[in-house]
A protein has these predicted regions:
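Condensing-enzyme catalytic core mediating Claisen C-C bond formation in acyl metabolism
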Residues: 1-86, 188-247, 329, 336-342
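Short coil/turn connectors at secondary-structure junctions
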Residues: 8-11, 109-113, 140-142, 168-174, ...
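Short beta-strand segments
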Residues: 15, 117, 174-180, 205, ...
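Conserved beta-ketoacyl condensing-enzyme motif
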Residues: 79-148, 254-272
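Short, well-ordered amphipathic alpha-helical segments that serve as non-catalytic structural scaffolds
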Residues: 87-104, 236-252, 305-309
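Claisen-condensing/thiolase-fold acyl-transfer catalytic domains that form or cleave C-C bonds
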Residues: 121-122, 126, 140-142, 148-166, ...
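Acidic-glycine-rich active-site phosphate/pyrophosphate-binding loop
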Residues: 124-138, 172-181, 214-217, 272-283
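Short, solvent-exposed loop/turn segments at secondary-structure junctions
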Residues: 183-186
Length: 342
C-alpha cells in the first residue's frame, strides 16, 4: 500500500477556488451522443479503436462481480449534469482562469505549477488538458496530470503541491485543476454505487498566503499493486477511509469534536453517513449538499465542494474543515483545513 502524508501545519494556503457545473441534466443511463457507426475521419477511427480496446479488456479481465458493501447499496441520482458544448479541457481552462483571476484581480501572473486531475477521456485523444493549460497560462513548470484515482486525485495533487513547495523555495503557487466529461461508449453508472456527472473545479494554493484556509494535514492511501482487484469490482473500502481519517486527525493533533465542517464525497448519502459513524465524526456537522440533481463529479467533486462551501459560510479564526474521499478500488484520502483570519 502506498501512503503519503503532509502535516506541515499550515505551510500551504488555499488562495482561490472556482467551479463550473453545467445547467443541463440527463438521466445517467442515457448516452448523450452515440459514437458514429462509420468514423468520419482517421482520428475518430483511432479514438473508437482505443475505446473499444479499453472496453474489451475490461470485459475479458473478469466476469462482472456483485460486491456486497454498504456503499454499493445506494439510491442512484435520478439526473446528472451533462456538458454538451464545452470539451473537458475547455471546462478546465475556464475554471483555471477564474481561480487565477480571483487570486490576482489585477495581476495575471502564471502559477509556478499546474496539476490536472481527470479520470474521463479528453474529447480528442491527441489533445492534452495539462499541456493546454500550461500553454495558455504560461506556467514555467512541467505540465503533468493525475488520473484513475477518482475522488482521491485532488488530495494527491494537494500532497504533491505541498511536497514541491517544501523542496523548492522558489515555488510559491500551484494551480490544481480537475475536470470530468463522460462520453460514450463509457457509462456514467458505476455499478450501483453512484452516477457520474460532468463538471470542473480549480484550487490555487500558495505558500504562506495570509488569511484563508490553511492545510493542516493531508493523507493519501492507495492499495498495493500486488493486491488483485478485478476491474469490475467497484466499491469503496470504508475501513481504509476510516483509518485514513483517524491518521489525519492524529497527525493534526485534533479530536473529531474540534472539527466544524465534515465534507464527504457526494458518492452517495448512505456511504457518507456510514463512514461518519464509523469514524465517530460529529454527525450534525456534516456538510452534504443534495447530490441528486448533479451526480458525482469524481475528480472535480472535492474542489467543487470546497468552492461551494467557501462561498456559503463566513468562518471564524481557527475553524476547521475535514474533507475525505475515496476511489472505486480501495483508495482513500483525507485533508484538514484550518481558517486563519490574519
Amino acid at each position: 500500500m502506498y501512503e503519503a502524508t503532509d502535516h506541515g501545519h499550515g505551510q500551504l494556503c488555499i488562495a482561490a477556488t472556482a467551479r463550473y457545473v453545467p445547467q443541463t441534466r440527463v438521466r445517467p443511463e442515457v448516452l448523450v451522443r452515440e459514437p458514429a457507426a462509420t468514423p468520419t475521419s482517421v482520428r475518430e477511427a483511432v479514438m473508437q479503436s482505443v475505446y473499444a480496446d479499453t472496453l474489451r479488456w475490461r470485459r475479458q479481465a473478469t466476469a462482472p462481480v456483485t460486491v456486497d458493501h454498504p456503499s454499493g447499496r445506494a439510491t442512484m441520482p435520478a439526473r446528472v449534469t451533462s456538458e454538451s458544448r464545452l470539451t473537458l479541457s475547455e471546462m478546465a481552462s475556464a475554471v483555471a482562469r477564474e481561480a487565477v483571476r480571483r487570486c490576482h484581480p489585477n495581476d495575471n501572473r502564471a502559477p509556478d505549477q499546474i496539476i490536472v486531475c481527470a479520470n474521463s477521456f479528453e474529447d480528442d485523444l491527441s489533445l492534452s488538458c495539462a499541456g493546454r493549460l500550461h500553454s495558455e497560462l504560461g506556467s514555467p513548470g512541467v505540465p503533468f496530470a493525475i488520473g484513475q484515482l477518482q475522488g482521491v486525485s485532488f488530495f494527491l495533487a494537494l500532497q504533491v503541491a505541498a511536497d514541491m513547495m517544501a523542496s523548492d523555495e522558489r515555488m510559491h503557487a500551484a494551480l490544481i485543476v480537475a475536470a470530468e466529461r463522460w462520453l460514450p461508449p463509457f457509462s456514467r453508472q458505476t455499478g450501483t454505487l453512484t452516477a457520474l456527472g460532468d463538471g470542473a473545479a480549480a484550487v490555487l494554493v500558495r505558500r504562506h498566503a495570509g488569511p484563508g484556509w490553511h492545510v493542516r494535514s493531508v493523507t493519501v492511501c492507495t492499495p498495493s499493486s500486488a493486491v488483485s482487484i478485478a476491474p469490475h469490482e467497484t466499491f469503496v473500502d470504508e475501513a481504509a477511509v476510516v483509518e485514513v481519517i483517524g491518521k489525519t486527525c492524529a497527525q493534526a493533533g485534533l479530536k473529531p469534536a474540534a472539527l466544524d465542517w465534515i465534507v464527504p464525497p457526494r458518492i452517495n448519502a448512505a456511504l457518507a453517513c456510514e463512514v461518519s459513524a464509523q469514524a465517530r465524526l460529529p454527525a450534525g456537522r456534516m456538510w452534504y449538499p443534495d447530490p441528486g440533481d448533479i451526480g458525482y463529479l469524481c475528480a472535480a467533486d472535492a474542489p467543487a465542494q470546497l468552492d461551494l462551501l467557501s462561498q456559503s459560510v463566513a468562518p471564524a479564526d481557527g475553524q476547521r474543515i475535514l474533507m475525505w474521499s475515496a476511489g472505486f478500488q480501495g483508495q482513500a484520502a483525507c485533508a484538514i483545513l484550518e481558517f486563519r483570519g490574519s
